[in-house]
């Protein structure tokens, strides 16, 4: 093959963005930056115009997740990566337990292990592509896992393990929040970032925190434990209650996030969003199961993610070459997670992505593979 094949136009998706974060941003979100941006860009984040945007985000998320009484929407700068450190400083009293099954679920466990103020965590691991069973241990005061392991496309439902009454349940929902079913009351901390289901830029973390979690934040503060101000959950809680962040936020991120939340709520809320991602994912997995050369990487259908699909290819087909040809035709970011090292494609199926585009993607893949023979 001397030149890049040109995929027929009738096989291409209308929008070729299938990244797992940063993810597709709707055109209407970008237009909203133009329409409302002049009233907030270049203005103080301590004044009403910007605080109104933060208030919209907080109230919109409370509606989207049907936030139980006493729960608070807390936010801060730095993304999920910063929140892991903030949680190690401000949520773990003595010792934590972590379920790990991939790159991102392992990161919080690593942060907890390296924090000098708490004990070494208990780590319950499963191989990439599979899911550990949520468990408890009487020695721990926080149990954490990823609602959706972005690197592998494995989803683990949110629940309270037996015997966990004295532990906070902290769920990393970075790529799952807004696209997977959840009852937030089953967690004490449900935290995420805007660049996945919420179709915004990164650099912000959001945590839905229960009264029990808020009490833990205050308890650890009162203990005198040293914490960098940037990672201080008491400071984040206080600022969030005033509809602001500790330090200057990226306003474009907040505006994109606010618009996406309004869009999701306007369409029917979390039920609508999860039915849309279920539609998209069923199209991808059914195609793979019927394919002669592709198969879902996650073998247990109960743990196949609705928002991140990983598809293994027969060794005779070079998935990297397929992704390269797709990219040359405007269908982008289908490459697998770099450290997983598998012959596969990874497909984002967040709410902004049209299920019809997922179907078109499978047609494009079939056509590309037919040209490689």
Swiss-Prot record:
InterPro entries from the UniProt entry: Aminotrans_V_dom, Pser_aminoTfrase, Pser_aminoTfrase_mycobac, PyrdxlP-dep_Trfase, PyrdxlP-dep_Trfase_major, PyrdxlP-dep_Trfase_small
GO MF annotation list: alanine-glyoxylate transaminase activity; L-serine-pyruvate transaminase activity; O-phospho-L-serine:2-oxoglutarate aminotransferase activity; pyridoxal phosphate binding
Cellular component annotations (GO), alphabetically ordered: cytoplasm
Catalytic activity: O-phospho-L-serine + 2-oxoglutarate = 3-phosphooxypyruvate + L-glutamate; 4-(phosphooxy)-L-threonine + 2-oxoglutarate = (R)-3-hydroxy-2-oxo-4-phosphooxybutanoate + L-glutamate
EC class (word): transferase
Note accompanying the cofactor annotation: Binds 1 pyridoxal phosphate per subunit.
Keywords recorded for this protein, A-Z: Amino-acid biosynthesis, Aminotransferase, Cytoplasm, Pyridoxal phosphate, Pyridoxine biosynthesis, Serine biosynthesis, Transferase
Binding site for pyridoxal 5'-phosphate: 104, 150, 172, 195, 247-248
EC number annotated for this UniProt entry: 2.6.1.52
Pfam families: Aminotran_5
Subcellular location: Cytoplasm
Pathway: Amino-acid biosynthesis; L-serine biosynthesis; L-serine from 3-phospho-D-glycerate: step 2/3; Cofactor biosynthesis; pyridoxine 5'-phosphate biosynthesis; pyridoxine 5'-phosphate from D-erythrose 4-phosphate: step 3/5
Cofactor(s) in the UniProt record: pyridoxal 5'-phosphate
Family annotation (Gene3D superfamilies): Aspartate Aminotransferase, domain 1 (3.90.1150.10), Type I PLP-dependent aspartate aminotransferase-like (Major domain) (3.40.640.10)
Modification N6-(pyridoxal phosphate)lysine, positions: 196
Residues annotated for L-glutamate binding in this entry: 46
Biological process (GO), any one: L-serine biosynthetic process
SUPFAM superfamilies assigned to the protein according to its UniProt record, in alphabetical order: PLP-dependent transferases (SSF53383)
Major localisation: cytoplasm
Family: Belongs to the class-V pyridoxal-phosphate-dependent aminotransferase family. SerC subfamily.
Subunit-level organization: Homodimer.
Biological role: Catalyzes the reversible conversion of 3-phosphohydroxypyruvate to phosphoserine and of 3-hydroxy-2-oxo-4-phosphonooxybutanoate to phosphohydroxythreonine.
Protein name (record): Phosphoserine aminotransferase
Upper lineage: Bacteria, Bacillati, Actinomycetota, Actinomycetes, Mycobacteriales
């Amino acid at each position: 093959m001397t030149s890049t094949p040109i995929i027929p136009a009738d096989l291409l998706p209308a929008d070729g963005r299938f990244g797992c974060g940063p993810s597709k941003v709707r055109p209407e979100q970008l237009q909203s930056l133009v329409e409302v941006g002049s009233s907030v860009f270049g203005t103080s984040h301590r004044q009403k115009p910007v605080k109104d945007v933060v208030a919209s985000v907080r109230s919109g998320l409370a509606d989207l997740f049907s936030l139980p009484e006493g729960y608070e929407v807390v936010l801060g700068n730095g993304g999920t990566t910063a929140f892991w450190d903030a949680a190690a400083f401000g949520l773990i009293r003595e010792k934590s337990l972590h379920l790990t099954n991939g790159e991102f679920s392992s990161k919080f466990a690593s942060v907890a292990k390296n924090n000098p103020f708490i004990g070494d965590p208990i780590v319950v691991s499963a191989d990439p592509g599979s899911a550990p069973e949520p468990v408890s241990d009487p020695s721990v005061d926080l149990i954490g896992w990823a609602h959706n392991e972005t690197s592998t496309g494995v989803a683990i439902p949110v629940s309270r393990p037996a015997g966990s009454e004295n532990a906070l349940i902290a769920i990393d929902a970075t790529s799952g929040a807004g696209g997977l079913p959840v009852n937030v009351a089953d967690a004490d901390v449900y935290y995420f970032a805007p660049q996945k289901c919420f179709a915004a830029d990164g650099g912000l973390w959001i945590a839905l925190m229960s009264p029990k979690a808020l009490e833990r934040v205050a308890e650890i503060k009162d203990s005198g434990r040293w914490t960098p101000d940037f990672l201080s959950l008491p400071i984040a809680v206080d600022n969030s209650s005033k509809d602001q962040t500790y330090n200057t936020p990226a306003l474009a991120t907040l505006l994109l996030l606010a618009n996406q939340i309004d869009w999701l709520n306007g369409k029917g809320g979390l039920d609508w969003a999860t039915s849309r991602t279920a539609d998209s994912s069923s199209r991808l997995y059914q195609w793979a199961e019927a394919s002669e050369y592709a198969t879902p990487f996650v073998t247990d259908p109960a743990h196949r993610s609705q928002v991140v699909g990983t598809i293994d290819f027969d060794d005779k087909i070079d998935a990297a070459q397929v992704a390269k040809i797709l990219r040359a035709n405007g269908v982008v970011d289908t490459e697998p997670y770099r450290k997983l090292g598998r012959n596969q494609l990874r497909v984002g199926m967040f709410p902004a992505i049209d299920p019809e585009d997922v179907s078109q993607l499978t047609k494009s893949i079939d056509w590309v593979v037919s040209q490689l023979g």
